Amino acid sequence: MSIFFKPPIDIEILFDNEESRKHVDIATRSSNSSYKSMKESLPVYEDGESLGGIVTLRVRDSKKVDHLGIKVSVIGSIDMLKSHGSGNSSSKKVTSSTSSSSSNGSVDVRKNSVDQFLCQSYDLCPAGELQHSQSFPFLFRDLSKRYESYKGKNVDVAYYVKVTVMRKSTDISKIKRFWVYLYNSVTTAPNTLSANETKATTNDIAGGNYAADNASDNTQTKSTQGEAADVNQVLPISHSNNEPKPVRLDIGIENCLHIEFEYAKSQYSLKEVIVGRIYFLLTRLRIKHMELSLITRESSGLQTSNVMTDSTAIRYEIMDGSSVKGETIPIRLFLSGYDLTPNMSCNYFNVKNYLSLVIIDEDGRRYFKQSEITLYRTR
């Protein structure tokens, strides 16, 4: 209906120095049925950084518009798919006025807000009359931002500025989104593997036997490594004496294959390189090729209705053909060239990252094992 009944006021929101700021391109879902791929460029802000700009109101057709006041708000919310039972949450919810005629840009209508963790607002203009275009500056000083922005398949962490023109009939509103990065101040430790290190000084992880696929079933053998701590806004990264211990996975199929998969540490910044190696102790399995993947796992919803979604952020082939006993394959995985998500966690969702080693034999059977790593953002 908005095609036939346009609001009498156009609202434009501009952030200070927006053009000179760093931007990120975020995939958005088209509001129509064509599902065309779209991207939106959003300015990036940090925790504690002030947010200011100018709101311009333009009256259509030079008509006078009465209003009950003009308000500007900055909002941060966690949004989840409507089918995930978010209505059971007792947390503070975002309430959407049914009388609001808003231009919401790329807001995903499939998702409901389950937690509004940030909401600050103040009046730009008292009740009165608009006869011509007017501009109003706004500023939110030292704005605290609890979570990093995130756009997943089932959950979003969204930040936006909302301007509302309050009226007796239908309110007119407009939002403008921005993106938030949270940086960890940890100093990264050396990312190397010493050839003289022994198992007694490493973080050993006892890997179980691989399970082969039958016809179409994949059986995953899970690592017994302790899970890395979940994080909220800043990851609690700690390095003892600045010397992280390497992680070693012993992987094997009885009387067929025995591999040592080792990498330098379990915590990486998004700009680092994962350095490791694969050492073959026993090779009676006819291997076709081997892949290394970095998998991002999103878990959303309440515990009774938890939904897990995996997406492969990185995949590349590290070996083609069979190997021989004693062969070593070096690994260098550069993280900076990919759009990765740091580990995140809150009451409604968490995001974890895993290294996955996949072996495919000549019969097409797949053997794989995963080990959790912690990713965090640094400047």
UniProtKB/Swiss-Prot annotation:
GO terms for biological process: endocytic recycling; intracellular protein transport; protein retention in Golgi apparatus; retrograde transport, endosome to Golgi. Gene3D superfamilies: 2.60.40.640. InterPro entries: Arrestin-like_C, Ig_E-set, Vps26-related. Keywords: Phosphoprotein, Protein transport, Transport. Residues 84-107 have a biased composition (Low complexity). The modification Phosphoserine is found at S216. One of its GO terms (cellular component) is cytosol. GO terms for molecular function: protein transporter activity. Residues 84-108 are annotated as: Disordered. Pfam families: Vps26. Belongs to the VPS26 family. Plays a role in vesicular protein sorting. Required for the endosome-to-Golgi retrieval of the vacuolar protein sorting receptor VPS10. Component of the membrane-associated retromer complex which is essential in endosome-to-Golgi retrograde transport. The VPS29-VPS26-VPS35 subcomplex may be involved in cargo selection. Component of the retromer complex which consists of VPS29, VPS26, VPS35, VPS5 and VPS17. Component of a retromer subcomplex consisting of VPS29, VPS26 and VPS35. PANTHER family: VACUOLAR PROTEIN SORTING 26 RELATED (PTHR12233). This is Carboxypeptidase Y-deficient protein 8. The lineage of its organism: Eukaryota, Fungi, Dikarya, Ascomycota, Saccharomycotina.
